[in-house]
Amino acid sequence: MARYKDSTCRLCRREGTKLFLKGDRCYSDKCAVARRSYPPGQHGQGRKKVSEYGLQLREKQKVRRIYGILERQFRNYFEKAERQKGVTGENLLILLERRLDNVVYRLGFADSRAEARTLVRHGHFLVNGRKVNIPSYLVRPGDTISVREKSKASPKFKEIAEAAAHRNVPAWLKADSSTLEGHVLALPTREQIDTPAQEHLIVELYSR
């Protein structure tokens, strides 16, 4: 699948907020947004009046980039959210949170969603005891996500286990860093999703 190849820090600066695309670096003084809180490029520091459509588009791009999803797939998630009962914008965020790569990241088993996506693709994770190497796989309440026994012995996952012990996990998940195993306790509520999103703007954009 095609992916954005330019600097991920430029994406954060373009959106004017931290997208947490580079793991621990995003929490440090090295974060590009902390050092240069204006868009990249020659005219980045110039002030522009943004139209209503521009605000909606930027919000969609921001959320899409946070979860590392291309436009067609993001549109598919929106259409699925629209068909579900409830608030479309909230349904959209819940679907994105249920992605296996996001859950691996939320459990603390990867520094970033991009790293989680790579680890899932390489077959390091099991869902209910079966290998799943599809990052977009949607987890359900009651699912158990674990690291393959063979992978646990690698230096990489020993580092992950050590780091995971100090990471906060959202209330809808439960993680055990000693066994590198996590459980989906429930679907997340909107209040439990800390993604900096104004999802109503995305709904307005796609409703045009």
From Swiss-Prot:
GO terms for molecular function: rRNA binding; structural constituent of ribosome. This is Small ribosomal subunit protein uS4. Residues 98-164 form the S4 RNA-binding domain. SUPFAM superfamilies: Alpha-L RNA-binding motif. The gene is rpsD. One of the primary rRNA binding proteins, it binds directly to 16S rRNA where it nucleates assembly of the body of the 30S subunit. The keyword Disulfide bond does not apply. One of its GO terms (cellular component) is small ribosomal subunit. CDD domains: S4. InterPro entries: Ribosomal_uS4, Ribosomal_uS4_bac-type, Ribosomal_uS4_CS, Ribosomal_uS4_N, S4_RNA-bd, S4_RNA-bd_sf. One of its GO terms (biological process) is translation. Keywords: Ribonucleoprotein, Ribosomal protein, RNA-binding, rRNA-binding. Part of the 30S ribosomal subunit. Contacts protein S5. The interaction surface between S4 and S5 is involved in control of translational fidelity. HAMAP family: Ribosomal_uS4_B (MF_01306_B). Belongs to the universal ribosomal protein uS4 family.
